[in-house]
Swiss-Prot record:
This is Photosystem II extrinsic protein V. Heme c binds at C70, C73, H74, H125. Belongs to the cytochrome c family. PsbV subfamily. The gene is psbV. It is found in: Cellular thylakoid membrane. It is a peripheral membrane protein. It comes from the Bacteria. The lineage of its organism: Bacteria, Bacillati, Cyanobacteriota, Cyanophyceae, Synechococcales. PSII is composed of 1 copy each of membrane proteins PsbA, PsbB, PsbC, PsbD, PsbE, PsbF, PsbH, PsbI, PsbJ, PsbK, PsbL, PsbM, PsbT, PsbX, PsbY, Psb30/Ycf12, peripheral proteins PsbO, CyanoQ (PsbQ), PsbU, PsbV and a large number of cofactors. It forms dimeric complexes. Its main location: membrane.
Length: 170
């Protein structure tokens, strides 16, 4: 019986020593620290070079909006229906018009256009103007769209190549 208590005591002491170290490492990891710095939270506002800086709480709210409204088809920045077009910054910058800024993404969410900007895809892609596709997007207001755009533009900075990277990362 005494050896059982001694064994439990040693295990408890080890746990009390190791647990704070593990918690400390997870809280102070470089990825977590870099996740919310001003550079990460600053993204292009429009095509004219102006910038906008989101707050940490805005991006956290935006993450919830993205997950509840967009992640069904765009989980981790991948487009399920077209693997050639992701939500990574390079793909967004090559769209026409460019969608690598808040204004461009908000406009796309209001009026979805093909990647080359030639025709509307509102009948097949959810958006504020979409007919019967994912009608709950119609409940999003301009601020919600702005936050979702901010989340998309900061996600690659936080997640790296995994954002929009496709199947090789899953």
């Amino acid at each position: 019986m005494a050896s059982l208590f001694a064994s439990l005591g040693r295990s408890l002491i080890k746990l009390l020593i190791v647990l704070p170290v593990i918690i400390g490492l997870s809280i102070s990891s470089p990825a977590m620290a870099a996740q919310w710095d001003a550079e990460t939270l600053t993204v292009p506002a429009g095509s004219g070079g102006q910038q906008v800086t989101f707050s940490e709480s805005e991006i956290k709210s935006a993450s919830k909006l993205f997950k509840s409204n967009c992640a069904t088809c765009h989980n981790q920045g991948v487009t399920k229906t077209n693997q050639n077009v992701g939500l990574d910054l390079e793909a967004l910058s090559l769209a026409s018009p460019a969608r690598d800024n808040v204004d461009g993404l908000v406009e796309f969410l209001k009026n979805p256009m093909s990647y080359d900007g030639e025709y509307s895809i509102a009948d097949t892609h959810p958006g504020i103007s979409s007919s019967d596709v994912y009608v709950q997007m119609r409940t999003l207001n301009d601020e919600d769209l702005r936050l979702i755009a901010g989340y998309i533009l900061t996600a690659e900075k936080v997640q790296g190549d995994q954002w929009g990277g496709g199947k090789i990362y899953f």
